[in-house]
Amino acid sequence: MKKKSLTELISDLKGNENVVNWHEIEPREAKTRPMPESIDERIKAALSKRGIDELYTHQYSAFQYVQKGESIVTVTPTASGKTLCYNLPVLQSIAQDETNRALYLFPTKALAQDQKSELNEIIDEMGIDIKSFTYDGDTSPAIRQKVRKAGHIVITNPDMLHSAILPHHTKWVSLFENLKYIVIDELHTYRGVFGSHVANVIRRLKRICRFYGSDPVFICTSATIANPKELGEQLTGKPMRLVDDNGAPSGRKHFVFYNPPIVNKPLNIRRSATAEVNELAKEFLKNKVQTIVFARSRVRVEIILSHIQELVKKEIGTKSIRGYRGGYLPKERREIERGLREGDILGVVSTNALELGVDIGQLQVCVMTGYPGSVASAWQQAGRAGRRHGESLIIMVANSTPIDQYIVRHPEYFFNRSPESARINPENLIILVDHLKCAAYELPFRADEEFGAMEVSDILEYLQEEAVLHRNGERYHWASESFPASNISLRSASQENVVIVDQSDIANVRIIGEMDRFSAMTLLHDEAIYLHEGVQYQVEKLDWDHKKAYVRKVDVEYYTDANLAVQLKVLEIDKTKEKSRTSLHYGDVTVNALPTIFKKIKMTTFENIGSGPIHLPEEELHTSAAWLEIKTADEDIGEKTLEQLLLGISNVLQHIVPVYIMCDRNDVHVVSQIKAAHTGLPTIFLYDHYPGGIGLAEEVFKRFSDINEAAKQLITHCPCHDGCPSCIGTEIEGIKAKERILQLLDQMS
């Protein structure tokens, strides 16, 4: 049978009735500038061997700004040569003066390893003795000593910087005395709690640099987000120059939204996205068109992989289709990456591990199983197809979830608007106090010293009263025997964490993670299904007193969702927007939450297939919230009906908030109350699910009119009769729920 070309397959797809939007991105010519004359001849020769004799405009701009001592954030698409934006000035600096040093921060170990091998290839071709080392948990003690003394370029991650480098800075004197550049790659991944912690780690890093007499320039790179310059400045505390004049070429891209057919009309349930992805990928692979499939979890990766291998084993054999996810050994991952670059591997099914800048060469087709959760992630994944020249195809196959349905019905949101803003709150008191402890352990604090832009004398006095610090004249010294960084996780806002223990293999019981207490109530109760790096675990026992959750690997087709009985108390109102019938506020609240029952929800249809009780004590959370009060409701709506309508609105808002604010669905909780304690009015609260808040609720307050408009659009365009899991929740009998909810949302806008 004659193989079809990609062009023919694209033409066939145009006739598919499930294609709901077809967006074409025109090809773009390269925009280049000559190689700057100041660049060392050995670097020019090494780049020339790799076919690089000119620079793209963004690489040229980045080099010029950094040479002037400006800190920069470079924002260009995947595979546009961002790495040269930092490698070039760093290598130039060390070629000019071999005492100069650079620190590279990557969010994952895999990415650090990948960048190290690319960097070492250039260094080898330069013929200069520049030593670059990765420094992570796998680095052997013998190598560690070498890195500290002789590493020109130290490649690590924020967790190692926080717990292994900064507390032992006296062993790293040659790095800190001569540190010229700090590179932060994949800046957009530093958001929420993690980003708020990392901003404080950077404050500690800058403090130690000042102590050793260095003032490094920051070179950041980011995927496309709405606020890269602002995020870079918040994270580093330095003014940033934005470099976004992308000069890299790209071929024609077809970006297709595909909505599976409805199989249950009353409930508006569609055929599973996984089944559609299998069929679509099969067509490309059997015609030998190199394809990448993205799935949200490891379990889904393995399911799709086995299905596709089965579907195409006669045509191309199973060896040329591989899975790729965290948990694979580095050797195996390198082999898959090489196979993709060289064309021996035709298809790969991956979690978002391949979203970040690992070099896998040029693929022709990218298929996404569902919306990846943010516009930035979707564009990162799309960038994996047609990385250099030639035509490419991206297909996003929608799930039945409200957020997926909103995206495929509103392509203009996806293609025309700026993507989401990444939010951090380095001043979160719990996070800030933790890092002040670490900073005081590293170097004594002067009484008048600032940390970031904050005066911290009150906090230092408090820590002295708690006997954590000891004051001697004008300085505060660390007074405790303990080592603070080892007890502080960068992934959690509160350090009173529940440790998650995997006992799937009794001979190899291991800790796989931790979670703050407040989240653990709803995500780690007995019988909960917990997802860790895409693997499903069931909680066999939550030992609340000793803060341990014992889990075992399972493979099930449902997830669990806990009901919380929530009492909210408003502590302080900071901002208000008044409308004739509603008021929108932002401020501080306490949340008293008691988990009551959990439900088992089927992944494909969102049906409730079982439930059980949760026996845990009440917990209190101090956080920030945005809340909307309805001052006057229509008189013909009874209290019971209004309560149901508020629940419906809450369901929609819970799904829509992550479309506008870069966060996961569980980061902002939505709770409705028919009579709020402080006013007696019907109220919907949207609160940060982290102690102290991390800036998400404030962003909800700022962007509420956009969020409200999106909620109305979602309900209006949902084809169900009067409510379904894809919009306001299951049907509310006999009250014209959709119509009335739209009226209420109109009053709020």
From Swiss-Prot:
SUPFAM superfamilies reported in the protein's UniProt record: P-loop containing nucleoside triphosphate hydrolases
A Pfam family of this chain: MZB
GO annotation terms (biological process): interstrand cross-link repair; nucleotide-excision repair
EC number: 3.6.4.-
Ranges where the Helicase C-terminal domain occurs: 276-430
Keywords: ATP-binding, Helicase, Hydrolase, Nucleotide-binding
Positions of the Helicase ATP-binding domain: 63-243
Sites where the protein binds ATP: 76-83
Gene3D superfamilies reported in the protein's UniProt record: P-loop containing nucleotide triphosphate hydrolases
Membrane-spanning parts: none
Short sequence motif named DEVH box, residue ranges: 185-188
InterPro entries, per database record: DEAD/DEAH_box_helicase_dom, Helicase_ATP-bd, Helicase_C-like, HRQ1_WHD, MZB, P-loop_NTPase
Alphabetized CDD domains for the sequence: DEXHc_Hrq1-like, SF2_C_Hrq
Keyword Cell inner membrane appears in the UniProt entry: no
One example GO MF annotation: hydrolase activity
PANTHER family (alphabetical): ATP-DEPENDENT HELICASE HRQ1
Family, per entry: Belongs to the helicase family.
Protein name stated in the entry: Uncharacterized ATP-dependent helicase YprA
